[in-house]
Swiss-Prot record:
Gene Ontology molecular function, alphabetical: calcium-dependent protein kinase inhibitor activity; protein kinase binding
GO terms under cellular component: dendrite; postsynaptic density; synapse
Subunit structure and binding partners: Interacts with CAMK2B; the presence of Ca(2+)/calmodulin increases the interaction but is not essential. Interacts with CAMK2A; this interaction requires CAMK2A activation by Ca(2+).
Membrane-traversing stretches: none
Organism for this UniProt entry: Bos taurus
UniProt protein name: Calcium/calmodulin-dependent protein kinase II inhibitor 1
Main localisation: other
InterPro entries: Camk2n
Amino acid sequence: MSEVLPYGDEKLSPYGDGGDVGQVFSCRLQDTNNFFGAGQNKRPPKLGQIGRSKRVVIEDDRIDDVLKNMTDKAPPGV
């Protein structure tokens, strides 16, 4: 897990001129290798696999009629 640590005393600076206002300090992440999760160790997809999805099941009883009507009619302007 990453730890959030301040840069150091030299990076600390007062905020504004008021005496009651606290100090603002910057933080940095230590060990950012695992910051984005374990998915970074996966290999990239091959070129033929990009854009392909798994099987999709369409559960609509009217899908045959809709697809049939789309192929029967030519879109306007063609």
